[in-house]
């Protein structure tokens, strides 16, 4: 028996980092994806030929991991298997259309895909809510800090608004279009999250005020998306980027790209996701794509998808 889970990757439109501290956020799934394939084997074996530059191979029976990057990715897989008490040995193959740690939610996708595929292989029928909750708890366990935004967005799919307070979500029916690409990051999302936590502890009042403004922007952005008022929405993207800059989340290259976008008259542009480089999104235009390519950004297929994780028995 072989089970394959296909997980859409995601872009964060508004509220990244603020969502960790119970402010609202908006994210959407895109046409880039990650697949997790689970098949019968006599021992636990994890293979990821595309998720890292050199590829990864791990024998859990011997517990030998040579790559630091592999440790980060495969820790998620191990925790999923451990959650299900490693009931049956399997081979797990992970393939992604993009490289990891670029702000597109590949870490969450690894977890969601493994939870969905391995549970189905074991004959356990989980609801989407159960997949999302299990995945979020595992991400939180591994990283120490995490919001539910990535795991829930990739489980359910579509453009999703997460209200303040960390409970519930709302899917928004829209044909919103973006131009998106990614540049190299200087640190992982987990590392950026801890940097932001340090800032919070040293400047709590200022930090909370900035997050409150980001929350107000996110709520206004939700209304503008529904109204399809992309002119004002684009202005809020620039403001949101500036606030993320004030939190130390952006990078010099990303700031330069966003500044240049504004000079060129591109309607809206900001970083998306963890920061420190990574993904950059703009209101869809030819000019935005030309700009991103001029900085050697890898353009991603940012077409909005309505489906979350799906699985098939092969």
Swiss-Prot record:
<keyword id="KW-0443">Lipid metabolism</keyword>
<dbReference type="InterPro" id="IPR022937">
    <property type="entry name" value="Mevalonate_kinase_arc"/>
</dbReference>
<dbReference type="Pfam" id="PF08544">
    <property type="entry name" value="GHMP_kinases_C"/>
</dbReference>
<dbReference type="GO" id="GO:0005524">
    <property type="term" value="F:ATP binding"/>
</dbReference>
<feature type="active site" description="Proton acceptor">
    <location>
        <position position="150"/>
    </location>
</feature>
<keyword id="KW-0963">Cytoplasm</keyword>
<protein>
    <recommendedName>
        <fullName>Mevalonate kinase</fullName>
        <ecNumber>2.7.1.36</ecNumber>
    </recommendedName>
</protein>
<keyword id="KW-0418">Kinase</keyword>
<keyword id="KW-0460">Magnesium</keyword>
<dbReference type="InterPro" id="IPR006204">
    <property type="entry name" value="GHMP_kinase_N_dom"/>
</dbReference>
<comment type="similarity">
    <text>Belongs to the GHMP kinase family. Mevalonate kinase subfamily.</text>
</comment>
<dbReference type="GO" id="GO:0019287">
    <property type="term" value="P:isopentenyl diphosphate biosynthetic process, mevalonate pathway"/>
</dbReference>
<dbReference type="GO" id="GO:0005829">
    <property type="term" value="C:cytosol"/>
</dbReference>
<dbReference type="GO" id="GO:0004496">
    <property type="term" value="F:mevalonate kinase activity"/>
</dbReference>
<dbReference type="InterPro" id="IPR006205">
    <property type="entry name" value="Mev_gal_kin"/>
</dbReference>
<comment type="subunit">
    <text>Homodimer.</text>
</comment>
<dbReference type="GO" id="GO:0000287">
    <property type="term" value="F:magnesium ion binding"/>
</dbReference>
<dbReference type="Pfam" id="PF00288">
    <property type="entry name" value="GHMP_kinases_N"/>
</dbReference>
<dbReference type="InterPro" id="IPR014721">
    <property type="entry name" value="Ribsml_uS5_D2-typ_fold_subgr"/>
</dbReference>
<feature type="binding site">
    <location>
        <begin position="103"/>
        <end position="109"/>
    </location>
    <ligand>
        <name>ATP</name>
    </ligand>
</feature>
<keyword id="KW-0547">Nucleotide-binding</keyword>
<keyword id="KW-0414">Isoprene biosynthesis</keyword>
<keyword id="KW-0067">ATP-binding</keyword>
<comment type="function">
    <text>Catalyzes the phosphorylation of (R)-mevalonate (MVA) to (R)-mevalonate 5-phosphate (MVAP). Functions in the mevalonate (MVA) pathway leading to isopentenyl diphosphate (IPP), a key precursor for the biosynthesis of isoprenoid compounds such as archaeal membrane lipids.</text>
</comment>
<dbReference type="InterPro" id="IPR036554">
    <property type="entry name" value="GHMP_kinase_C_sf"/>
</dbReference>
<comment type="pathway">
    <text>Isoprenoid biosynthesis; isopentenyl diphosphate biosynthesis via mevalonate pathway; isopentenyl diphosphate from (R)-mevalonate: step 1/3.</text>
</comment>
<keyword id="KW-0444">Lipid biosynthesis</keyword>
<dbReference type="InterPro" id="IPR013750">
    <property type="entry name" value="GHMP_kinase_C_dom"/>
</dbReference>
<keyword id="KW-0808">Transferase</keyword>
<dbReference type="InterPro" id="IPR020568">
    <property type="entry name" value="Ribosomal_Su5_D2-typ_SF"/>
</dbReference>
